Swiss-Prot record:
GO terms for molecular function: cytidine deaminase activity; identical protein binding; zinc ion binding. Residues 48-168, 187-295 form the CMP/dCMP-type deaminase domain. The keyword Translocase does not apply. This is Cytidine deaminase. Pfam families: dCMP_cyt_deam_1 (PF00383), dCMP_cyt_deam_2 (PF08211). The lineage of its organism: Bacteria, Pseudomonadati, Pseudomonadota, Gammaproteobacteria, Vibrionales. It comes from Vibrio vulnificus (strain YJ016). Binds 1 zinc ion. Keywords: Hydrolase, Metal-binding, Zinc. InterPro entries: APOBEC/CMP_deaminase_Zn-bd, CMP_dCMP_dom, Cyd/dCyd_deaminase_Zn-bd, Cyt/Deoxycyt_deaminase, Cyt_deam_dimer, Cytidine_deaminase-like, Cytidine_deaminase_bacteria. Homodimer. This enzyme scavenges exogenous and endogenous cytidine and 2'-deoxycytidine for UMP synthesis. It catalyses: cytidine + H2O + H(+) = uridine + NH4(+); 2'-deoxycytidine + H2O + H(+) = 2'-deoxyuridine + NH4(+). Zn(2+) binds at residues 102, 129, 132.
Length: 295
């Protein structure tokens, strides 16, 4: 990761690389920029807000894991708190393409798992595909969400997705990233399973009712959570494992570091993530133990 950042710094404008390097090369950099950090960079570089976000995209793309396409995409979302969160596309060797995570989904789920309850804007390298436009339409802030592309005027999501189909068309009032706690608890004393339940309580699954969460523990002892993000169009839904894997990559860890995994889901769900979770983790490392609980 450090070498990717160094390459991006070498290609960035000098005023940006000089002031950004101490931030992103720090051991505790977590793929996000606080409002204070971003405002300081604006002053130090003399760039506009839009220009700086676009200039930061190569640093978001540095997190890309794309062994199949070798097409590295970065995205940056700004939460309602003002914090900026990086994201990048993620692919898996030996797993069907439906498990792929797009850069927009990565950045959005990053902000979501860090506690944001909505987004004001998203900045991306390339025009968002239909899959991602639909994914963003599930957000609590979809009506106001702005999209910034390089060398283009900022537009709202619904300029890219007119006459959209969304949760309201299915009679659903809840939205992805809205504050929620589903109230699940378990008597299981396994610490990793307890964390998976924590993620489950934040999940969004109004269509299948498969409220679910994943927790991954790595060799470092750190735990990464993923909550299920369901979508009105079904296919753009983001499984809890992928959300957890995104958090892991954006923390600078590697899939090879995963020691154990836990999945918990509602017994009332019309689907199950168990088989896909097991098969995807097996493709990463067949020795990863997976604990499972249905509540």
């Amino acid at each position: 990761m450090k070498s990717r950042f160094e390459n991006a710094l070498a290609s960035a404008p000098e005023s940006l690389s000089r002031h950004l390097a101490p931030i992103i090369l720090a051991a505790d950099f977590d793929a996000s920029l606080s409002t204070v950090q971003f405002d300081e960079l604006l002053k130090q570089t003399g760039m506009t807000d839009n220009q700086l976000r676009v200039a930061l995209l190569p640093f978001a793309a540095a997190y890309s894991y794309a062994p199949i396409s070798e097409f590295y995409v970065g995205a940056i979302v700004r939460g309602l708190s003002g914090t900026l969160y990086f994201g990048a596309n993620m692919e898996f060797d030996g797993v069907q393409l439906g498990q792929t995570v797009h850069a927009e989904q990565s950045a959005i789920s990053h902000a979501w798992m860090k506690g944001e309850q909505g987004l004001s804007d998203i900045t991306i390298n390339f025009s968002p595909c239909g899959h991602c436009r639909q994914f963003m339409n599930e957000l609590s802030s979809a009506k106001e969400l702005k999209i910034q592309l390089p060398e283009r005027e900022e537009k709202k999501l619904h300029d890219y997705l007119p006459d959209s189909f969304g949760p309201s068309d299915l009679g659903i009032e809840s939205a992805l990233m809205s504050q929620v706690h589903h109230g699940f608890a378990t008597e299981d004393d396994d610490a990793l399973m307890q964390r998976a339940v924590e993620a489950m309580n934040r999940s969004h699954a109004p269509y299948t009712h498969n409220l679910s969460g994943v927790a991954l523990q790595t060799e470092s002892g750190r735990v990464y959570l993923g909550a299920y993000a369901e979508n009105a169009a079904f296919n753009p839904s983001l499984p809890p494992l992928q959300v957890a894997l995104i958090q892991l990559l954006l923390a600078g860890e590697r899939f090879e570091n995963i020691q154990s995994a836990a999945l918990v889901e509602s017994h009332k769900g019309k689907i199950s993530h168990l088989a896909c979770t097991q098969s995807t983790l097996e493709a990463l490392n067949p020795d990863i133990p997976v604990s499972y609980l249905s509540l």
